[in-house]
């Protein structure tokens, strides 16, 4: 009789231990899933920048958005743009959070309120997106297809966090960008064609 009671007691302890272990495994799996979900949520964070084609005389026109996201390799800028001129265009972060026109030499200049290329290190040099001695705002050129759309993402390897670019503006210039100040300054790009404030 005593043996039976001892056996039953042992079985009860074993069952309770098994349940506790199973519960522990469940909680561990739950915590792991929560950690994974948190990481996924972080990776889903983004800034959506509304972009307008600049036309001080007739009014600006909405041409889509650029989404900025974090990646292991730097910030990714994904355009969802339309109605732009075909070809390569200079693509930069400018210092001020404005796309307003301003006067220069008695003429109204589109997007001049954005200031110059974002250059927190005061390099005063235009260069490649990965150059340590160039504007932080220098991005890869933006490619616009024949139908006027731009959807190809570009990577800014020196920029890591979304917070870095908030409070500035995103500028698209007419014409390409040779990522140099020679033979023309600031990559030889043309007028400020489209702009969006990064909030």
Curated annotation (Swiss-Prot):
So where does Cu cation get bound?
Answer: 92, 94, 117, 173
What molecular functions are annotated in GO for this chain?
copper ion binding; superoxide dismutase activity
Its cofactor is: Cu cation; Zn(2+)
> Bound how, and how many: what does the cofactor note say?
Binds 1 copper ion per subunit.
Q: Which InterPro entries match?
A: SOD-like_Cu/Zn_dom_sf (IPR036423), SOD_Cu/Zn_/chaperone (IPR024134), SOD_Cu/Zn_BS (IPR018152), SOD_Cu_Zn_dom (IPR001424)
Subcellular compartments:
Periplasm
The entry marks the following residues as binding Zn(2+), namely: 117, 126, 135, 138
The signal peptide, as residue positions, is 1-22
Q: Its catalytic activity? A: 2 superoxide + 2 H(+) = H2O2 + O2
Q: Which cysteines are joined by disulfide bonds?
A: 99-195
The record's listing under Gene3D superfamilies reads: Superoxide dismutase, copper/zinc binding domain (2.60.40.200)
Entry's Gene Ontology cellular component terms: periplasmic space
NCBIfam families the UniProt entry points to: PRK10290.1
Role noted for this protein: Destroys radicals which are normally produced within the cells and which are toxic to biological systems. May play a role in the interactive biology of organisms with their hosts and so contribute to their capacity to cause disease.
- Its name, as the record gives it, is Superoxide dismutase [Cu-Zn]
Lineage of producing organism: Bacteria, Pseudomonadati, Pseudomonadota, Gammaproteobacteria, Pasteurellales
């Amino acid at each position: 009789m005593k043996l039976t009671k001892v056996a039953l007691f042992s079985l009860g302890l074993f069952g309770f231990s098994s349940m506790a272990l199973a519960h522990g495994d469940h909680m561990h799996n739950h915590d792991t899933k929560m950690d994974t979900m948190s990481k996924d949520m972080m990776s889903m964070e983004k800034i959506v920048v509304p972009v307008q084609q600049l036309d001080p005389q007739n009014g600006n026109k909405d041409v889509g958005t650029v989404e900025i996201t974090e990646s292991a390799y730097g910030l990714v800028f994904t355009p969802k743009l339309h109605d732009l001129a075909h070809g390569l265009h200079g693509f930069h972060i400018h210092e001020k959070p404005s796309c307003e026109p301003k006067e220069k030499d008695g003429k109204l200049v589109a997007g001049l309120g954005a200031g110059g290329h974002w250059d927190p290190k005061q390099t005063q040099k235009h260069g490649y997106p990965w150059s340590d001695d160039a504007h932080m705002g220098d991005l890869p050129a933006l490619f616009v297809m024949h139908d006027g759309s731009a959807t190809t993402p570009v990577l800014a390897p020196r920029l890591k966090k979304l917070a870095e670019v908030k409070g500035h503006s995103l500028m698209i210039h007419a014409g390409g960008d040779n990522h140099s100040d020679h033979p023309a300054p600031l990559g030889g790009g043309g007028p400020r064609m489209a702009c969006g404030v990064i909030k």
